[in-house]
From Swiss-Prot:
PANTHER family attached to this UniProt entry: 60S RIBOSOMAL PROTEIN L35/50S RIBOSOMAL PROTEIN L29, LARGE RIBOSOMAL SUBUNIT PROTEIN UL29C
Gene Ontology MF terms in the entry: structural constituent of ribosome
Keyword check for Ribonucleoprotein: yes
Protein family according to the UniProt entry: Belongs to the universal ribosomal protein uL29 family.
GO cellular component: cytosolic large ribosomal subunit
GO biological process terms on file: translation
Pfam families, A to Z: Ribosomal_L29
Record gene name: rpmC
Record keyword Nucleus present: no
Organism of provenance: Chromohalobacter salexigens (strain ATCC BAA-138 / DSM 3043 / CIP 106854 / NCIMB 13768 / 1H11)
Keywords: Ribonucleoprotein, Ribosomal protein
Identification of the protein by name: Large ribosomal subunit protein uL29
Length: 63
């Protein structure tokens, strides 16, 4: 997910996106713990997407 795409979304959409990403991160962690996760790069990708969304939310809160 690109930072520019995130910045174009509304605050409500960003909060919904953050919730979905946190759920996805939880599911990936559970898959890793049980040995079912074959694409481990997804953990890093989701973690960074969460950080991007949180950053943009903080930027919008400052405006």
């Amino acid at each position: 997910m690109k930072a520019q795409e995130i910045r174009e979304k509304s605050v409500e959409a960003l909060q919904q996106q953050l919730l979905e990403l946190l759920r996805e991160q939880f599911n990936l962690r559970m898959q890793k713990a049980t040995g079912q996760l074959s694409q481990t790069h997804l953990l890093k990708q989701v973690r960074r997407d969460i950080a991007r969304v949180k950053t943009v939310l903080n930027e919008k809160a400052g405006d």
